[in-house]
Amino acid sequence: MEPRPGASTRRPEGRPQREPAPDVWVFPCDRDLPDSSDSEAETEVGGRGDADHHDDDSASEADSTDTELFETGLLGPQGVDGGAVSGGSPPREEDPGSCGGAPPREDGGSDEGDVCAVCTDEIAPHLRCDTFPCMHRFCIPCMKTWMQLRNTCPLCNAKLVYLIVGVTPSGSFSTIPIVNDPQTRMEAEEAVRAGTAVDFIWTGNQRFAPRYLTLGGHTVRALSPTHPEPTTDEDDDDLDDADYVPPAPRRTPRAPPRRGAAAPPVTGGASHAAPQPAAARTAPPSAPIGPHGSSNTNTTTNSSGGGGSRQSRAAAPRGASGPSGGVGVGVGVVEAEAGRPRGRTGPLVNRPAPLANNRDPIVISDSPPASPHRPPAAPMPGSAPRPGPPASAAASGPARPRAAVAPCVRAPPPGPGPRAPAPGAEPAARPADARRVPQSHSSLAQAANQEQSLCRARATVARGSGGPGVEGGHGPSRGAAPSGAAPLPSAASVEQEAAVRPRKRRGSGQENPSPQSTRPPLAPAGAKRAATHPPSDSGPGGRGQGGPGTPLTSSAASASSSSASSSSAPTPAGAASSAAGAASSSASASSGGAVGALGGRQEETSLGPRAASGPRGPRKCARKTRHAETSGAVPAGGLTRYLPISGVSSVVALSPYVNKTITGDCLPILDMETGNIGAYVVLVDQTGNMATRLRAAVPGWSRRTLLPETAGNHVMPPEYPTAPASEWNSLWMTPVGNMLFDQGTLVGALDFRSLRSRHPWSGEQGASTRDEGKQ
């Protein structure tokens, strides 16, 4: 007996089987059955339209973007005849299929009449998916909702790896992997790397669900991304009441608000002002401000699922941008908070207005660094708290930063008193001051510190020329400090600051005032290495250059002060630089003489410290380089590797660091591209090839060095692991002299044809091999 059209017959396992009559269009609708799923009664298709079915099913399918598109495109513009379908009469051809809008199928069609076991609706072809590996058929919206709660098949309770969708007659298909399950993560990642994934399902907490993921070079974006907002009215009220933050004052990227002044109007018509935080704080809890700056007003729609919340979020910014926005936030504020991380709520917004009452300076990346040699008695004028700007300055808007704060720390106009000793120094220092326009509290303090250093240099010039302001005096030159600075510290601190200034000028490309400024080609690398040496390894200067050095002692400072005081008056073109250079040179010479008298320090050269005059002896290496001293040294852990110097584009400088190690001298290895020292070669005796080349280049080295004629020990590398000599005779072998290398590994020596030794340093023929290898 064939069933009537419009009626369905239920099997005990819950799957209906429909066998319609030939040439009859059948539209079964299981939604018209009674509430009990076990009922066997046959009912007629009632007068319910697809609109009622859409309302009933919206709670389970509202979170899926593809379902919303399907319902909007197919069910929205078309209507359904409300009359009952009479038994045996085919429906009209233009009526869409019921239960999800499945198109009508002819009798004998394939598996288009499958019913989803979750929603008990007929599965539309474009919403059909098969679970893997159990291959049960469901609709995509139901499985995406189900899989977020439990990664198992609704029928057989098997762990699922991915969903198979979009199967074509040719056999191609796409997948929707489940990427957050630890048990099936590997198989799901393989599906993503294969390039078949068109969407992904994130199980567990949806607040941490990403919008896209990338595996194996393939990026998969979520077709229906989740949002951090909860989907129920109770959760909305509780969460938003706890994190509620008044909308004002807020900072926009273009016009940061000021304390005590109204923020400039934002493009889009937002009318929330800074002086209204109290009015905004009294907003009712029923319309709180969401984490994204929109007011959730459509609470009825939110209760049905994620779809309603998206509609309210889309409509809220448009409604809140009018002149009477109330608690709503304007478009400008929404744009300002669009770049915030997802999931971050109110506490990020509840910040004071920037630069209104904040005492911390703003550090700018391009500002010059603070001087590490700042005297402790010199205060920073820019660090004092400043009162808030007046209302007139605040109303100027974005034109606030530069012109408003520049006069706060700039020096007063030059008067006749302070500039009298050095009339030519002011035009030379004016362009430097004009370039350093302070941008924040930190840069203002640094600029003031530099101006104080220049004033100290001018005071040094005044003392050297016999003018007012000599040791301990308070002449006009001390009044040149900007912004009413405190009296300058003692003469030793002034000379120490003046000795540091030439190093900064030399780093910025200015001229070195020292008379002996000639430097070898490798001077920058040597100066950089010498600047990083501790005080125990390198002297404060060398060869009369005003290079970097350690802080001066009291005796050296007094000597440099007396030298600077007895110097002649400089020319007007370079007053400050000449005085600072003379003080640095005299300080270096005096401190070098004092250290040379002790006999334990060394002078500085372009390539590092050189031996000082006096008795010498073995001393520690500055870089803690040590050598094996015992005869029974432990062999190396693997095969010996040899890297040619030409392979790393480096050169060995034949300028030894005498007595830098316990047993020998060091030769620096310089990078040819940068000129920096990248490594050191340690000599252990005077008979090696490198020692021979060094002796030829520097004849006096053999008289100064303390190296022995022949090293008394050597490290024993391990023997080559393969015994047969035939394996060594391959195309990869490269003979170099009487040594044999295999891709950089030394494997043999003495004779390329006979290979009497596995390794030139092996214990069997070690002595003869070494002797022949050096010849």
Swiss-Prot record:
Residues 369-390, 410-421 have a biased composition (Pro residues). Residues 258-284, 310-321, 391-409, 422-431, 477-493, 550-592 have a biased composition (Low complexity). Phosphorylated at Thr-67, leading to promote interaction with host RNF8. Phosphorylated by host CHEK2; leading to increased SUMO-targeted ubiquitin ligase activity of ICP0. GO terms for molecular function: DNA binding; ubiquitin protein ligase activity; ubiquitin-protein transferase activity; zinc ion binding. It catalyses: S-ubiquitinyl-[E2 ubiquitin-conjugating enzyme]-L-cysteine + [acceptor protein]-L-lysine = [E2 ubiquitin-conjugating enzyme]-L-cysteine + N(6)-ubiquitinyl-[acceptor protein]-L-lysine. Residues 617-626 have a biased composition (Basic residues). Residues 322-331, 464-476, 539-549 have a biased composition (Gly residues). Residues 293-302, 439-453, 509-519 have a biased composition (Polar residues). One of its GO terms (cellular component) is viral tegument. Residues 10-21, 45-57 have a biased composition (Basic and acidic residues). Its main location: host cell. It is found in: Host cytoplasm; Host nucleus. A zinc finger (RING-type) spans 116-157. Residues 58-69, 231-243 have a biased composition (Acidic residues). Residues 1-112, 221-636 are annotated as: Disordered. Pfam families: zf-C3HC4. Its EC number is 2.3.2.27. The keyword Electron transport does not apply. One of its GO terms (biological process) is release from viral latency. Keywords: Activator, DNA-binding, Early protein, Host cytoplasm, Host nucleus, Host-virus interaction, Inhibition of host innate immune response by virus, Inhibition of host IRF3 by virus, Inhibition of host mitotic exit by virus, Inhibition of host RLR pathway by virus, Metal-binding, Modulation of host cell cycle by virus, Modulation of host ubiquitin pathway by viral E3 ligase, Modulation of host ubiquitin pathway by virus, Phosphoprotein, Transcription, Transcription regulation, Transferase, Ubl conjugation, Ubl conjugation pathway, Viral immunoevasion, Viral latency, Viral reactivation from latency, Zinc, Zinc-finger. Interacts directly with human RCOR1/CoREST protein, leading to the disruption of the human BHC corepressor complex. Interacts with human CENPA, leading to its degradation. Interacts with human USP7; this interaction modulates ICP0 stability. Interacts with human CDC34. Interacts (when phosphorylated) with human RNF8 (via FHA domain). Interacts with human TRIM27. Interacts with human ZBP1. Interacts with host MORC3; this interaction promotes the degradation of host MORC3. Belongs to the simplexviruses ICp0 family. SUMO-targeted ubiquitin ligase that plays an essential role in nuclear antiviral defense evasion triggered by dsDNA viruses. Acts during the initial stages of lytic infection and the reactivation of latent viral genome. Prevents the antiviral effect of nuclear bodies by degrading host PML, SP100 and MORC3. Prevents antiviral response to viral DNA induced by IFI16 by degrading it. Additionally, inhibits host IRF3 nuclear signaling to prevent interferon production by the infected cells. This is E3 ubiquitin-protein ligase ICP0. It comes from Human herpesvirus 1 (strain 17) (HHV-1).
